[in-house]
Each structure stands twice: as C-alpha cells, then as structure tokens.
Amino acid sequence: MSSRTIMAFDFGTKSIGSAIGQEITGTASPLKAFKAQDGTPNWDDIEKQIKEWQPDLIVVGLPTDLHGKELDVITPKAKKFANRLHGRFGNQVELHDERLSTVEARADLFEFGGYKALSKGNVDCQSAVVILESWFESQWG
C-alpha cells in the first residue's frame, strides 16, 4: 500500500469543497470550501492549498445521475475544472463518480452536529471527504 497524499474536490458552480487524505490509511479530512463564479474559483487560493499540502494526486468528483449517466450542464464543467487543475499545477488528476456524495455528507454532518453543521461550505467539504474515501475504496477493490 502506498503512502501518497491525495487531495479531492467536490466541484460546484458556486462552491468547491476540498479534502485531504492519506492512501495508506484510506481516510480523509475536510479542508476548505472555495467560492466560485459559474465554476471558476480564485485560482490563487487553490494554488496556496496545493502548495501547502503538495498532493501526489488530485481526485475531482464527477457528477452523474443515479444511473451513472453524465449530466448535461455540470459534468462538462467538472471535467473542465479537472483539466484546468492539471494544466495549471501539473498534478495527476483523476475523476471519480460522486453519486449521492452530498446526501451522505449531509447525513454525516447532521449526525455529529445537527442542523447547525449543515452550512454550504461544510457540506461541500464533507462531500469531498466522501468522494475521496470512495476513491480509496475503489482502489482496494
């Protein structure tokens, strides 16, 4: 088992959640949510986080419907975001199915903090945690 550091993003047009995890443990922790305008974040803020954590790989959640079919509007924007991450920072970037990650994130947050924990930023970051932990599970098959 590798000891790579992996960063994940839960892409959204208004907010992009992030998380960090270690492949050796298969666990992830929330980082921060970045405000975005139509899916475009402040790239300087993203760069600071990438420089701070120096991930070996970045995972971006791929929005799909319940059947795994790509969505017309948001899926291409998430792919564009992933391509821009790779182009700007040179990191290897993988897309990973994010089906139901927000539902699971909301349930996790509510369990530990009630309604007060359900802020948009918290949900987006916890969604990134769910995406990353799901990616870890998919690697261990």
Curated annotation (Swiss-Prot):
One of its GO terms (cellular component) is cytosol. It is found in: Cytoplasm. InterPro entries: RNaseH-like_sf, YqgF, YqgF/RNaseH-like_dom, YqgF/RNaseH-like_dom_sf. It is an enzyme of class 3 (hydrolase). One of its GO terms (molecular function) is nuclease activity. Keywords: Cytoplasm, Hydrolase, Nuclease, Ribosome biogenesis. Its EC number is 3.1.-.-. The keyword Transmembrane helix does not apply. It holds the Pfam family RuvX. Its main location: cytoplasm. GO terms for biological process: rRNA 5'-end processing. CDD domains: YqgF. Belongs to the YqgF nuclease family. Could be a nuclease involved in processing of the 5'-end of pre-16S rRNA. This is Putative pre-16S rRNA nuclease.
